[in-house]
């Protein structure tokens, strides 16, 4: 579990209790019309306690009125506590994050190379700073010199230090993290108030935690039901007078509270907040509650092969020359094309070449390095005497053809052989002559087959996008268990895939980390960006994974579904409760005047007074009983949507009808001795 778990402590509970009383303010409760009605009823009951005959002759003792008042107060406090406790978890994490950036100083590098100590808040973008072992990095930036290990646990919760160095994919650093070895020179990329940590704090504190469309729709439904029940209660009073049935105002207030959907009304905000918090516990930042909720509607998941389905550290395992006489030349050419390649693949090619080549390989190569891009899909070096490139088969074949070169007859079979094993083939050319193929071995992550099977049962289709050729993609897709794949996929192709799926009415989720992924992340309904990715990718996405683990998208989608299921399950339970309470209480109230109603008093409640008190107590206790479910969410198993629906109707629908009858009867058996 991550570091947020430590916030389940006594201090949090005490703070939530304090906030429960603060939220009694009518200005606070007006945001929740259901609980607002309960508080208005509580205030009217308090008026009746002070002035018993203000609404006519009172037929209830002051002690009975005080009992109703206390139960109504406790009901509101329980509802407020559930929301305050959920909010408190986020605030506690925000306080911890804020501590990571407090009272920081920086060692600013002057133009003459001298150092000057300044406050971290004075740093400007573009300035250079030096951070040494044991010091906290004062601002977001990029490493321009040095190599060191950095402890990012204050931000990500991951205890293992990570290596940061200039160049490559690991040169970005976050303000508030700790250098645990050596030193770094960093170019500042953000100023005070705009850092990644500042944005995290704003997100965690819920600055943008507005109600989601589904939540608003449900609130509208519940408010409408509340108004309907209010109308029923108001019309009940003249009907009771006509039937010569005495129904004191306090009992009508209590009856109203029992019948309106107070259970889900008291828990709805907590469910939404807790859903965002569960995502945070997985070290994923949600920019809004809407993002988490949309995750629950996702039915198509676009996944990159490298890093998501496979481990991503493809390793060169073999050199396959077009003929054995070319082996030595192939090794040297592969080495030269990779010597300035900082990717894991490039480094593995250099290692393999050194292991296999018995003669001395060239060390200092004076030339122009051409890095890999998504468009060219090749990398290499051009010198005065020679040009050497390695890259994807199609790209290399097209390049050789454009320059009127020859294509060896067996080059295609060599590539197919590698692809059929699930590997990635890279063709190596020297001066437009094909020398052979590099076999990059890729390994599928453990447990993915089972997880994809579970997603399929939940109605989610998985689509693998990869730059590999169709044969390699098909082999990996079959082994991993994904539903479909898109081979030789470029960044713009991802956008087309997403738009095509959305045009069919699907809700699409995807992951990305590069600037070239930003348009697709913005187009997708759910975009999960990696913390190690570019700023543009993180701005385009609506979720950010602090662990930079693309596989996390699967967990986030499950949390979104859990949020929707929890809200639906507790709404079903609450409405079923109201129906049960209606048939439990009304006969007990009417049977003294209408003897025919006695047959409907199936629970044999002892008296109208005890029936009302018992129902009110049950109404308050059920909110407390359901807080753990609202916070943790209902269990999500790999069942089909139909199976989940049936299970929820049996557990929360039927259970919502049965539990009130049993609960109210048990409470009535105790209350009858005091009323």
Swiss-Prot record:
One of its GO terms (molecular function) is ATP binding. It holds the Pfam family Hydrolase. It is found in: Cell membrane. InterPro entries: ATPase_P-typ_cyto_dom_N, ATPase_P-typ_P_site, ATPase_P-typ_TM_dom_sf, ATPase_P-typ_transduc_dom_A_sf, HAD-like_sf, HAD_sf, P-type_ATPase_bsu_IA, P_typ_ATPase. ATP binds at residues 341, 345, 372-379, 390. Part of the high-affinity ATP-driven potassium transport (or Kdp) system, which catalyzes the hydrolysis of ATP coupled with the electrogenic transport of potassium into the cytoplasm. This subunit is responsible for energy coupling to the transport system and for the release of the potassium ions to the cytoplasm. Belongs to the cation transport ATPase (P-type) (TC 3.A.3) family. Type IA subfamily. This is Potassium-transporting ATPase ATP-binding subunit. It comes from Staphylococcus aureus (strain Newman).
């Amino acid at each position: 579990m991550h570091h947020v778990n430590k916030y389940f402590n006594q201090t949090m509970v005490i703070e939530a209790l304090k906030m429960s009383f603060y939220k009694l303010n009518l200005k606070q409760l007006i945001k929740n019309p259901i609980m607002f009605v309960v508080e208005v009823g509580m205030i009217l009951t308090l008026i009746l306690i002070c002035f018993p005959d203000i609404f006519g002759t009172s037929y209830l003792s002051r002690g009975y009125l005080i009992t109703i008042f206390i139960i109504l107060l406790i009901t509101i406090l329980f509802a407020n506590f559930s929301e305050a406790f959920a909010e408190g978890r986020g605030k506690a994490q925000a306080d911890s994050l804020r501590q990571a950036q407090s009272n920081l100083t920086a060692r600013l590098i002057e133009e003459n190379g001298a150092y000057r100590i300044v406050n971290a808040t004075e740093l400007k973008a573009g300035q250079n700073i030096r951070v040494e072992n044991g010091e906290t990095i004062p601002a977001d930036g990029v490493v321009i010199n040095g190599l060191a290990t950095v402890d990012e646990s204050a931000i990500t919760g991951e205890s293992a230090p990570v290596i940061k160095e200039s160049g490559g994919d690991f040169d970005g650093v976050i303000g508030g993290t700790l250098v645990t070895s050596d030193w770094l020179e960093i170019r500042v990329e953000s100023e005070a108030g705009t850092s990644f940590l500042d944005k995290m704090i704003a997100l965690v504190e819920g600055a943008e935690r507005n109600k989601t469309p589904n939540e608003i729709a449900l609130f509208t439904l519940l408010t409408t039901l509340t108004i309907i029940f209010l109308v029923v209660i108001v019309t009940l009073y003249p009907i009771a007078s006509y039937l010569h049935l005495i129904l004191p105002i306090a009992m009508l207030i209590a009856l109203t509270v029992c019948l309106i959907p107070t259970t889900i009304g008291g828990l709805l905000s907590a469910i939404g907040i807790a859903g965002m918090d569960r995502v945070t516990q997985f070290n994923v930042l949600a920019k809004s509650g809407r993002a988490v909720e949309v995750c629950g509607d996702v039915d198509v998941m676009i996944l990159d092969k490298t890093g998501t389905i496979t481990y991503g550290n493809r390793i060169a395992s073999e050199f396959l020359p077009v003929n054995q006489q070319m082996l030595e030349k192939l090794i040297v050419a592969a080495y030269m094309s990779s010597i300035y390649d900082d990717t894991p693949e490039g480094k593995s090619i250099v290692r393999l070449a050194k292991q296999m080549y018995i003669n001395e390989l060239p060390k200092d190569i004076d030339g122009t390095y051409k890095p890999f891009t998504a468009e060219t899909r090749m990398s290499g070096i051009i010198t005065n005497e020679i040009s050497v490139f390695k890259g994807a088969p199609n790209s290399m074949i097209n390049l050789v053809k454009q320059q009127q070169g020859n294509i060896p007859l067996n080059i295609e079979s060599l590539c197919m052989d590698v692809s059929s094993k699930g590997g990635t083939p890279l063709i190596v050319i020297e001066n437009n002559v094909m020398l052979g193929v590099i076999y990059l071995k890729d390994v599928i992550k453990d447990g993915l087959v089972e997880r994809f099977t579970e997603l399929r049962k939940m109605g989610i289709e998985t689509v693998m996008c990869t730059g590999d050729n169709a044969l390699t993609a098909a082999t990996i897709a079959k082994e991993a268990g994904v539903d479909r794949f898109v081979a030789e996929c470029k960044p713009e192709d991802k956008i087309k895939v997403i738009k095509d799926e959305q045009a069919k009415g699907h809700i699409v989720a995807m992951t990305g980390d590069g600037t070239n992924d930003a348009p697709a992340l913005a187009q997708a309904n759910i975009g999960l960006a990696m913390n190690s990715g570019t700023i543009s990718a993180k701005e385009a996405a609506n979720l950010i994974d602090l662990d930079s683990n693309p596989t996390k998208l699967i967990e986030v989608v499950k949390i979104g579904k859990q949020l929707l299921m929890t809200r639906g399950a507790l709404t079903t339970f609450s409405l079923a409760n109201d129906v049960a309470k209606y048939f439990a209480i009304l006969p007990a109230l009417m049977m003294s005047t209408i003897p025919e109603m006695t047959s409907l008093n199936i629970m044999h409640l002892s008296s109208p007074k005890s029936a009302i008190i018992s129902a009110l107590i049950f109404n308050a206790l059920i909110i407390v009983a359901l807080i753990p479910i609202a916070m943790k969410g209902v269990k999500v198993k790999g069942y089909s949507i139909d199976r989940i629906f049936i299970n929820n109707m049996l557990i929360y629908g039927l259970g919502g009808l049965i539990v009130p009858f049993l609960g109210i009867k048990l409470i009535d058996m105790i209350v009858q001795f005091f009323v």
